[in-house]
Each structure stands twice: as C-alpha cells, then as structure tokens.
Amino acid sequence: MAVVIGRTSEFFDFFVYGTASVLVFPNLLFPEIDRLTATLYSFALFSLAFLARPVGSVIFMEIGRKLGRGVKLTIALFLLGISTAAISFLPGYNQIGYAAVYLLAACRIGQGLALAGAWDGLASLLALSAPDEKRGWYAMMPQLGAPFGFLLASGLFAFFVSALSTADFLDWGWRYPFFVAFAVNVVALFARLRLVMTEQFSELLDQRELRPTSVFEMIRAEGGKVIIGAFAPLATFALFHLVTIFPLSWVTLFSTQSPGEFLVTEMVGASIMIVTVIASGAIADKIGRRTLLGIAAGLIAAFSFVAPLLLAGGVGGQTGFIMLGFGLLGLAFGQSSGAVASKFSGKYRYTGSALTSDLAWLVGAGFAPLVVLGLSSSFGIAAVGAYLLSGAACTLASLTFSRQLETVE
C-alpha cells in the first residue's frame, strides 16, 4: 500500500503540472504570442524536469550513501512539495514579465531533481522479492500509481475548468490542484518513511543488494546495460505522454471539444488503464515479461498507424484514441519497471535501475509533447504515428539485444 500511495503522489504531481502546461501556463506566461507557440514554449518548460532527473540521481545517490535512505527520501519529497507549492503562488507575465518564466523553470527543475531523489527501490524490491510465479504481479503494483494519479489530477482540473469562468480559472482556480499536490506529498512522505525506516525493509534491501553505489562507478562497470535498459520501455514511454498530455493540447488547439469534457474522457481511459495494468501482472506471470513487452511494443506499432486517423476523426475518433491508447499503455506500462532491475548485477542494481528509469523517461517521454505538437502542427497529425512507431522499433531492438530479461518465470 505504501508503494502505491507513494507512486500515486508522484504521478499526481506529474499530471497536475502536465495538465497546467496545456490549460494554464500558455495564457499565464505567454499571453502576447499565439496559443500554439505559447503551448510549445510551455512544453519546453515541461521537459526541464526530465533533463534534471539524471542529475538528481547523481546528487541523491551520494546523499543516500552518506546520510541514509530516510534522509534522502525526506529531502527529496520536501523539495518536491516545496517546488509544487511554489508554483501555486506563481505570478504571471502581466505581473512580473518574463521573470515568471524563470521562476517556473526553477520550480520545474526542482521537481525533476526531487523525483530522482524519491527513488527508494520499492518497485525493484517488490519485483525481486516476489515468488517466481508472481513476479509480474508484484512488479505491476507500483505502476498503478500512474492511472490513480492521473484520475486525481484530471478530476480536479475538470471540476475547476467546468465550474469556473475562464477568467476565474486562469486567475486562481488552477492553483488549487497544486495546493492539493503539496498536501498529498506530506501524506505520502510519512507513509513511505514508516516503511523505509523499518528494520525489516532495510534487511530486505540488503538481502537483495539494493544499496546505492556511485553512479560513475556503476556506469564504468555496467553502462551498456543502462543504455539497453533505457530503450527497453521506450514504446511505453512514447505512448505515455501521447495519450495523457499531448491529446489535451491537440483538442484544446484544434478541436471544438471543451477541455473539461475531454478530461472526463481521459479519466475513463485512465480507468481502463487500471484494469490493463492489473492484467499485465497476470499475463507476465504466464508468458514472461520479455514476451509481454515485445507483444505490447508490436501492438503499439500497429496502433501508430491508426492513431492519426482517430485523432483527426472528430469527437468519436478522439474518444477511441483515448480508450485504445490507455488500454495499451496499461498493458505495457504495468511491466516497464519490473524489467529493469533484473538486468543489473546485485551490486549495481539499485543505482542502475534508478538511472535507467531516468534516461528512459528523458528519451521516451520528456520531449514527446513538444516534439509531436511541433511536428503535427507543421507537417500534419501523422507525426503522432511516426513518433509511436519509432518508440516501438527502439523497444523491439532493445529486447532483441538483451538476453537477461527472463522469458518465462
């Protein structure tokens, strides 16, 4: 339960900011330029957290080695909470000009550093400590934080967008989800500390050799595994933002649907994702994680050919895109973290898993909304399919070269 609560709080923060990147920051920070360009600038700020995450891993791994897991996690979650709460008080361009952009950039970098520091090894521990016949099931559990966090964030924004006038929403309504995010972080901090600081948890980490090591030492010893591991879930992470953040921007800019209505549609999609994340655990225990990731990548590749047609197909097509996209995402995302830890030797498993996750998010998801919106607005909606297809190809290539993911547990 602590794992799910902790991951839900992280993803709630993640999606609160992502949704605001579409509905709030283009108007708040760039009111004097056209909406499309303003959204692209907003997505550029969005990507800063992903650039900061590998740096955060280097910093917080050292803190963990020298001061302990509890201190590391406390600093990380306080930084995450402070960065998120500070955004809720952010003045706009009309108050302080482009200084508001720099303030938001600083907060976003703080979020990225903190998310890297919040890596506690719980997901890896679950996957490695589970019975052989249940490893896929246990690896799936932390991944439920993504759809739960999305449901909470989208529900809040859907309420405020629908209940308030545009002026009131842009003035003060958008700030409340960030206040809630801070409160959720406080609850998550104490829930995770109660687990992380127990002797039983420390003993389990030691038994599985999940201890922080120097990032640079790990890269020298097993850097190749980091590269392979970062590409293994690329199809998943490419799809991640193309069904959560990007469609909201596309609908807001180029469709007649209201943001509130579309957020409700995405919430239904997230509910489907919960089901398919759970299903991924059962399926992985039957056929193996490597096989499931390969099948999911193949399905995402097939989806890439119909995704542009659905997005261009009006309300019905866009609804179909969301339902199919979230369903596929759950199937792939459910095992994307469980596959990483098994690639590293015991000594480097903790640090290697953290850095691999950071790089996978950076390459696959960090720039996805920016790149796809920019390409789609210039060359057509087919760019969505091309981006998804490239991610699927990278995943299949990585799985071909990797031989350490088990085929059948």
Segments predicted by a language model, with ranges:
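Glycine-rich segments within core transmembrane alpha-helices of 12-TM secondary carriers
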Residues: 137-161, 184, 356-368
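Hydrophobic core of transmembrane alpha-helices in multi-pass small-molecule transporters
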Residues: 97-116, 317-331
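Cytoplasmic membrane-interface "Motif A"-like loop-to-helix N-cap segments
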Residues: 66-78, 286-297
